[in-house]
Amino acid sequence: MIRVAINGYGRIGRSILRALYESGKRQQMQIVAINELAKPEAIIHLTQYDTTHGRFAHKVKLVDDHMLIGDDAIKILHEPDPTKLPWHEMDIDIVYEATGVLLDRQSCEAHIHAGAKQVLISHPSSADVDGTIVYGVNHDLLRAEHTVVSNASCTTNCIVPVIDVLDRHFGVKSGAITTIHSAMNDQQVIDAYHDDLRRTRAAGQSIIPVDTKLARGIERILPHMKDKFEAISVRVPTINVTAIDLSVTLEKTVDIATVNHVLESAANGRFNGILGYTDEPLVSCDFNHDPRSSIVDGTQTRVSAGQLVKLLLWCDNEWGFANRMLDTSLAMIAAKRG
């Protein structure tokens, strides 16, 4: 049994725990510890009840310093210094680093020094980690010696499989991306101070442009795409699910039917369970709690002059990403154990 700890129990940390139980992967992995500075009562409550994803199917109880889920007892820790975490004593195989704060090798190696064998970061990281993985595209690069790995971002996981498919079939010359992302907890409920002046404004009242490094994230996964993409991002007043407007110029001449056929075939084949395809007239909330990284909306595919293709992609930026955290961590463990 793989022994897991979660460091940082916010939106992604809680989604990882719930996804573990809902996906059936609990038979392979067990969460034995959560390190979170919040009060235990709040930890239990937000595990049981969630505005976005609904009630957790399992009853959650607090007994002493443990969260009980059925027969599973998960130790709740409140340690701000990761070097002092009891990972050696708890025989932790892998830590999900989900604070959004520890984003480079040196800071994440605190978990290794504390006794964990591997760390998977739930965020884009600095370039000095052992690898940045988009599961389904490059997880085969994982090696036994890799100890600190990034799971990239939700939007990178959404867009890279699609770019990979298009490039393999038609060749991608260049592209431009607009991410239409649900509001996040680094924004304000009502106007308040923030270093980013746009993020001083109420999240529920505006479409808010924010910085994004998505184009650079694509390059890290697909190095041959260096300097071929640029991206912008806006936050919109919804609490979950993200849309990506992707425009690419292809080397080959195509039509809408050809593009959609190739993407649907990939969704049913190599990327089954990771990439999806729909031709139904759906809206963003229809993709809430969808475990896939990306869903192509075939009704919105457009082709101009044979080589300029516009696509609309959907993803649950919480749930899909949490499921890829599970997949990537299992691949890391498999690589380590040979």
From Swiss-Prot:
Subcellular localization, as worded in the UniProt entry: Cytoplasm
Keyword terms: Cytoplasm, NAD, Oxidoreductase, Pyridoxine biosynthesis
PROSITE patterns in the cross-refs: GAPDH
InterPro entries from the UniProt entry: E4P_DH_bac, GlycerAld/Erythrose_P_DH, GlycerAld_3-P_DH_AS, GlycerAld_3-P_DH_cat, GlycerAld_3-P_DH_NAD(P)-bd, Glyceraldehyde-3-P_DH_1, NAD(P)-bd_dom_sf
A single cellular component GO annotation: cytoplasm
SUPFAM superfamilies: Glyceraldehyde-3-phosphate dehydrogenase-like, C-terminal domain, NAD(P)-binding Rossmann-fold domains
Chemical reaction(s) catalysed: D-erythrose 4-phosphate + NAD(+) + H2O = 4-phospho-D-erythronate + NADH + 2 H(+)
GO molecular function list: erythrose-4-phosphate dehydrogenase activity; NAD binding; NADP binding
SMART domains, A to Z: Gp_dh_N
Site (Activates thiol group during catalysis): H181
Record-listed substrate binding positions: S153, C154, T155, R199, T212, K213, R235
Residues holding NAD(+): R11, I12, N317
GO biological process: glucose metabolic process; pyridoxal phosphate biosynthetic process; pyridoxine biosynthetic process
Active site: C154
EC number: 1.2.1.72
EC supergroup of this enzyme: oxidoreductase
Record has Magnesium as a keyword: no
Subunit details: Homotetramer.
HAMAP family: E4P_dehydrog
PANTHER family reported in the protein's UniProt record: GLYCERALDEHYDE-3-PHOSPHATE DEHYDROGENASE 2
Physiological role: Catalyzes the NAD-dependent conversion of D-erythrose 4-phosphate to 4-phosphoerythronate.
Name assigned to this protein: D-erythrose-4-phosphate dehydrogenase
Organism: Shewanella baltica (strain OS223)
Lineage: Bacteria, Pseudomonadati, Pseudomonadota, Gammaproteobacteria, Alteromonadales
Gene of this entry: epd
